[in-house]
């Protein structure tokens, strides 16, 4: 894949203030299909803030972001309502995004079959994370923005997620993930805040 | 006999016989009371003429409304302290029935009130308001139980509410003495014994007994259903466990 | 415009509104409770009650719309759902309107439907007017929910913003309340009042969603 | 008994009550809003207003205690604070009472203090009675907050349990509302009413904390 | 330390139902001073539930728990109010527990000095965790119950926490921690759910 393709995401000169203080400035990055960038930085360095910015949720103080591709965003908070079971949650977003993926298959792939009908309020921490990751499989989108994806996952869950991410990268997708541990998928570059 | 109320198995056996007996005896008493009340006793013009005959439903219903809430509170207390599952089953069974009898008291009271007091409802009357809120308490109890996710939690939450809500019962009973109310003060259940004329009193007491028996029978039937449902749930869980 | 996300937002909000227990029964309980407490304080003079009845119903509608709305958007911020909705690609104003409509259907409309009963409790004469009033209450409460939604969205990041909502939303309620009660009392100048009420509701439905969308974007930032 | 945790609970709750924006200004806004909306619905006949004034203030107190309390315990469940309080070793009933008291001081008492102003808005004659009434409102609202706290604790695990709270708490409010309005209207048999109001408040303060504690233990389970 | 000391915690025959299903049953464990038990198990196995039970927050369906020693509990949720800064949070609990530890020192030890005055609502995920762990140092208590302690911590944070835990164990404390990764402190036993 040496054909020069258009980047899925490019940003330059990003800066943000938090409480009168510059959290970071001059951050730029470019992401081509098949690439994985890992964000590193101490607690409170601004990884979550940068990811939210790239997702279009937070307005940068300065800098430019171009994101021609569709993206998925999985943050610290999973976006599952207390009354929503994983099955209902996925059905809802399948509907909203017009996806026709098989929800039963996705639940199976994420080992959520047993918890499929437990309301969000009672899910375990790992089950909540898995439900959020299930959204990634609902609709194919080139760009994935993942904030500390390994959080709360057991060993099997991490392996499963690594496979999903590797598969995504192989088929021309790209990811940016913030992480404190070693990544279990091929990393193109690391950005440290 | 009391042991039968502590042990679900014995309770099922006991209630299989007792519930139909209660229905039968209860219906007999109620019908006799109604027959006396509607056709035999003289009407009392001071109490609105023929409409006063609604008394033979209204007063037993009022008694049962208070008694059933007290029963709910006591059953909740027993469950809360000793964790007798049957007490919770009883509480759960009493609530909807108590609501029905409370509604009956309100409805008959209103119907009686229109000709005698000239109004269906009096908003600042402490007796009427406190009975209305008794109905709210029953409904709130049911809504609270329904909103809990497990049986154990429903029982705990319900018990707390039922015990706290018991403040309302004395308020209902003594509201007519404490406040100026359109409602007449108690004339049957008073500290110095009944003051009502015997023609009215006997059928009224028999009716009251009838309502109590019918209520008791219905509670037992509800409890039997609930016991069986819990058994099924338990067996299903065991089967799933393998 | 793709209607699927908007429809999904509506369904989610509706499910959420019903999830907290017994659904529409509860706002009814709230309204009933308010209606019951008022005369306790006021006394039971038939004339006074008849005079205050419609006013009390309006106020109860306004207050219970506030209680309902307090948590809508705040919950979305806290559990991360708002992030997802902001990124659906659907216009956020439409999503916000769908959510508000769902909550109105679950909590507002049942209140309006119960209003004739309440009016009777307040010693009103049973008449066809009560049905007409039901329509006015429904219209008015829709406006209450939309303006309340703006307040809720503005205070979504402030924990315990419920009372802040009241301060923001109550002034917005005033025109609706004025036209509504005018339409009902039928005094001088009340001929056009139902039209004015409808217009003010229409205005709320047209303007509030954009305000909500802007406020929600701010809440996520 | 070690008072330190109880005092800490009080301080935390007080800080929380004031954090959500402008603190006591907000309940005042709420009460003011209600006071403004009511005459709008009722019309401005002096006699009617004077008659309904005290009732409206009672109702506003009751409703705003509900709005305030909705989130107290629910927030504690959601952010994990409840787990910490349950494990301090201090009696949970005392902690719950301290929290309730703090919220009453931040939101209930200011309302009571504002009541003479509101009464004047409702065309009441300025007189010393208004100050006496202030005391009655303060007493009564304390009972409202305690019973409301029981409702809030019971529905703390149910999201959007606010309306469930209303159904649970309103019946518990009745004795207080009855005695309170009786004491104010000063009709026949009202001689003992202030005492009865005080007794019902005392009863609430004595019983409600235990019910709250039991309900909170349940919410954490 | 072969002197037989009284256990800090002992439990036997613990069982719990969740949604009509037995989540676990027949769990027992004993913890002596200086011991560390790690709870293992797949997502949703019941680690959090067991820890809450040991902390006295959840009622077991069956079984006995004896916990003669005082304990600290750090769950998935940190117990920090949105308006509380780390400094205020620690001052509050110091007050409640009657501790006279120096809060400035503790903030320093957890590298929270910069975030010490940021309200809870704005703290980063790692800063929230660190604030919760700071409570462990406020008051010495023999038994620590930690649910996934490494979550959201950066590398420096994990090292720091390992040191704190090792120190605690050396001075006769004991811990039970649920974990998906390898522990960085000496583990006495693993319990798998
Ligand atoms: C909705 C309105 C009413 C309600 C909520 C109501 C409620 C009650 C209650 C709770 C009792 C039981 C009191 C006790 O045992 O101490 C009772 C008894 C009674 N009620 Fe009513 N009532 C209403 C209307 C009326 C009316 C309109 C009348 C007739 C004018 C009436 C006549 C009676 C009588 C005669 C008793 C028996 C009291 C006794 O002798 O102990 N009630 N009612
Ligand atoms: N209003 C504010 N005042 C002061 N500081 C703030 C404010 N809002 C946010 N901050 C700071 O901004 C930073 C936000 O960082 P962010 O959540 O992006 O960190 P992160 O790199 O994701 O950290 P972690 O690894 O802990 O998740 C934190 O250091 C926080 O203390
Ligand atoms: N009401 C309920 N109905 C059905 N299942 C329930 C209910 N409440 C809890 N559960 C199940 O109980 C389990 C709770 O597990 P817990 O949170 O203790 O897991 P955990 O081992 O901590 O998992 P994780 O590693 O993901 O944190 C989950 O599997 C959850 O689905
Ligand atoms: Mg982060
Ligand atoms: Mg867990």
UniProtKB/Swiss-Prot annotation, chains A, E:
Give yes or no: UniProt keyword Cell membrane. Answer: yes
- Cite the EC number: 7.6.2.5
One matching Pfam family is: ABC_tran
Domain ABC transporter intervals: 9-191
Q: How does it sit in the membrane?
A: Peripheral membrane protein
Subcellular location(s) per record: Cell inner membrane
Alphabetized GO MF terms: ABC-type heme transporter activity; ATP binding; ATP hydrolysis activity
Q: Which reaction does it catalyse?
A: heme b(in) + ATP + H2O = heme b(out) + ADP + phosphate + H(+)
**What does the UniProt keyword field contain?**
ATP-binding, Cell inner membrane, Cell membrane, Cytochrome c-type biogenesis, Membrane, Nucleotide-binding, Translocase, Transport
InterPro entries recorded:
AAA+_ATPase (IPR003593), ABC_transporter-like_ATP-bd (IPR003439), ABC_transptr_haem_export_CcmA (IPR005895), P-loop_NTPase (IPR027417)
Which BP terms does GO give this entry?
cytochrome complex assembly
Q: What is its main location?
A: membrane
Extract one GO cellular component term from the record: plasma membrane
Residues bound to ATP: 41-48
Q: Which domain of life is it from?
A: Bacteria
Q: What class of enzyme is it?
A: translocase
Q: Which family does it belong to?
A: Belongs to the ABC transporter superfamily. CcmA exporter (TC 3.A.1.107) family.
Function recorded in the entry? Part of the ABC transporter complex CcmAB involved in the biogenesis of c-type cytochromes; once thought to export heme, this seems not to be the case, but its exact role is uncertain. Responsible for energy coupling to the transport system.
Q: Describe its assembly.
A: The complex is composed of two ATP-binding proteins (CcmA) and two transmembrane proteins (CcmB).
The protein, known as: Cytochrome c biogenesis ATP-binding export protein CcmA
Q: From which source organism is this entry?
A: Hyphomonas neptunium (strain ATCC 15444)
Gene name tied to this protein: ccmA
């Amino acid at each position: 894949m040496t054909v020069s393709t258009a980047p899925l995401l490019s940003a330059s000169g990003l800066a943000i203030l938090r409480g009168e203080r510059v959290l970071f400035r001059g951050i730029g990055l470019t992401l081509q299909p098949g690439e994985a960038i890992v964000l590193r930085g101490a607690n409170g360095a601004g990884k979550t803030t940068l990811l939210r910015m790239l997702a279009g949720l937070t307005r940068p103080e300065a800098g430019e972001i171009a994101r021609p591709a569709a993206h998925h965003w999985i943050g610290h908070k999973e976006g599952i309502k207390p009354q929503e079971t994983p099955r209902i949650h996925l059905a809802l977003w399948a509907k909203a995004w017009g996806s026709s993926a098989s929800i039963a298959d996705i639940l199976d792939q994420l080992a959520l079959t047993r918890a499929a009908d437990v309301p969000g309020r009672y899910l375990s921490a790992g089950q909540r994370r898995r439900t959020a990751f299930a959204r990634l499989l609902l609709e194919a989108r080139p760009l994935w923005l993942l904030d500390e994806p390994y959080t709360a996952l057991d060993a099997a869950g991490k392996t499963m997620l690594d496979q999903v991410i590797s598969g995504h990268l192989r088929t021309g997708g790209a990811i940016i993930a913030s992480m404190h541990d070693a990544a279990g998928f091929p990393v193109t570059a690391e950005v440290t805040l | 006999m009391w042991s039968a109320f502590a042990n679900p198995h014995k309770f099922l056996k006991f209630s299989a016989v007792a519930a139909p007996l209660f229905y039968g005896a209860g219906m007999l008493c109620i019908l006799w009371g109604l027959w006396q009340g509607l056709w035999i006793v003289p009407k009392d013009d001071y109490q609105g003429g023929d409409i006063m005959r609604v008394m033979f439903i209204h007063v037993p219903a009022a008694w049962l409304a208070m008694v059933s809430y007290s029963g709910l509170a006591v059953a909740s207390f027993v469950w809360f302290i000793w964790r007798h599952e049957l007490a919770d089953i009883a509480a759960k069974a009493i609530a909807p029935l108590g609501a029905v009898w409370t509604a009956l008291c309100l409805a008959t009271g209103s119907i009686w009130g229109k000709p005698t007091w000239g109004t269906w409802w009096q908003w600042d009357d402490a007796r009427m308001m406190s009975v209305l809120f008794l109905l709210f308490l029953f409904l709130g109890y049911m809504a609270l139980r329904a909103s809990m996710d497990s049986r154990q939690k429903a029982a705990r939450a319900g018990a707390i509410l039922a015990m706290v809500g018991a403040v309302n019962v004395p308020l209902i009973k003594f509201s007519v003495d404490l406040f100026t109310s359109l409602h007449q003060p108690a004339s049957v259940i008073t500290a110095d014994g009944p003051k009502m004329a015997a023609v009215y009193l006997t059928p009224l007491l028999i009716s009251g007994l009838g309502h109590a028996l019918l209520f008791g029978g219905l509670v037992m039937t509800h409890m039997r259903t609930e016991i069986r449902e819990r058994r099924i749930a338990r067996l299903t869980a065991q089967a799933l466990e393998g | 415009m793709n209607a699927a996300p908007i429809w999904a937002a509506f369904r989610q909000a509706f499910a959420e509104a019903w999830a907290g227990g017994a659904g529409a029964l509860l706002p009814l309980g709230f309204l009933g409770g308010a209606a019951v407490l008022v005369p306790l304080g006021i006394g039971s003079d038939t004339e006074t009650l008849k005079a205050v009845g419609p006013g009390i119903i309006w106020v109860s509608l306004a207050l219970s719309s506030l209680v309902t709305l307090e948590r809508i958007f705040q919950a979305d911020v806290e559990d991360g759902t708002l992030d997802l909705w902001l990124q659906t690609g659907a216009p956020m104003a439409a999503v916000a309107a769908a959510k508000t409509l769902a909550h109105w259907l679950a909590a507002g409309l049942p209140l309006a439907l119960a209003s004739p009963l309440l009016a009777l409790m307040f010693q009103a004469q049973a008449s066809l007017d009560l049905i007409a009033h039901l329509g006015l209450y429904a219209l008015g409460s829709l406006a209450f929910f939309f303006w309340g939604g703006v307040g809720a969205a503005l205070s979504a990041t402030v924990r315990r913003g419920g009372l802040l909502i009241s301060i923001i939303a109550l002034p917005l309620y005033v025109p609706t309340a004025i036209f509504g009660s005018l339409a009902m009392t039928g005094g001088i100048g009340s001929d056009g009042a139902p039209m004015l009420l409808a217009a003010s509701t229409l205005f709320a439905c047209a303007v509030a969603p954009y305000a909500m969308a802007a406020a929600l974007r701010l809440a996520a930032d």
